[in-house]
């Protein structure tokens, strides 16, 4: 089994029974993010970006599954710390180059979900603004 397939399997199990802001299965949020990013490592991180925060997974367990230190570090960067405010979280996540594209896709998807569900959107807009102003990168060739 490839690392990408294993990441999807882990995320599907970890988020079983969880729902996104619109009431859909949470794994669909992870899949939308993976569909948005470009590289294989970004896709793996996309599937796993919330497994530490929203389930019983740990860094050590992900490492034991054979995910590279770079992937595990990116997942850790995308894991909110206790007492961490939204904007500090965005900045910390974006400081990890592998996590940055995933965080952007995550914020964009959360913004769409919040809009569809009639929920507040300001924190997602502000997070995207921080990425645009403080972490702007030239577009990647396609």
Language-model segment annotations:
Residues 1-142:
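Active-site helical microenvironments for divalent-metal-assisted chemistry
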């Amino acid at each position: 089994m490839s690392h990408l397939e294993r990441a999807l399997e882990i995320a599907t199990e970890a988020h079983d029974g969880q729902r996104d802001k619109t009431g859909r299965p949470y794994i669909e949020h992870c899949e939308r993010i993976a569909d948005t990013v470009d590289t294989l490592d970004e896709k793996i991180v996309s599937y796993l970006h919330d497994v530490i925060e929203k389930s019983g997974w740990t860094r050590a367990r992900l490492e034991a599954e054979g995910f590279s230190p770079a992937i595990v570090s990116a997942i850790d960067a995308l894991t909110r710390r206790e007492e961490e405010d939204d904007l500090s979280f965005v900045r910390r996540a974006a400081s990890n180059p592998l996590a940055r594209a995933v965080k952007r896709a995550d914020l964009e998807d959360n913004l769409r979900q919040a809009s569809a569900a009639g929920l507040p959107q300001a924190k997602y807009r502000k997070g995207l603004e921080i990425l645009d102003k403080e972490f702007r990168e030239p577009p990647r060739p396609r």
